[in-house]
Amino acid sequence: MNDILEIAAANQQRAREVIRDTDLEAIWRSVGAEANLVGSLRTGLLMKHRDIDFHIYSSPLRVADSFAAMARLAENPRIRRIEYGNLLDAQDQCLEWHAWYADADERLWQIDMIHMPVSYTHLT
């Protein structure tokens, strides 16, 4: 059990280093959005999967603002890849972003960002 807790603690520390290095929260604030940490990192259950999940809220949600934030994130040399999905006309009504960050040991971290209008804050 102690090994599991140690792994979780180490991964949480590394994940928070990724968030600091990418300046992710400030990047989203710069386009008028609020980034909220969700998922396994927030709950303290980050184990094997190196993933960081954010719900991003904007009012109004503008595709151009979302792209501007991701352009700034892409300037970080540790970002290896970014994927985009426009689900504004689907039930989810969001923009999906997935970025892969290589840490100092070249381990990839997946950063999932779901960009939604403020009216969807009741879903978190």
List each model region and its residues.
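Helical scaffold of the NTase/Pol beta-like nucleotidyltransferase catalytic core
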Residues: 1-38
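Acidic-enriched, low-complexity/disordered segments with a strong bias for Aspartate over Glutamate
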Residues: 3, 21-23, 51-53, 65, ...
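Active-site nucleotide-donor binding segment shared across nucleotidyl transfer reactions
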Residues: 24-67
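Generic structural hydrophobic/aromatic packing signal, biased to beta-strands
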Residues: 28, 35-37, 73, 99, ...
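Short amphipathic alpha-helices in soluble, non-transmembrane regions
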Residues: 67-74
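Conserved catalytic core of two-metal-ion nucleotidyltransferases
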Residues: 78-116
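Conserved small/polar residues in nucleotide/adenosyl-binding loops
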Residues: 121-124
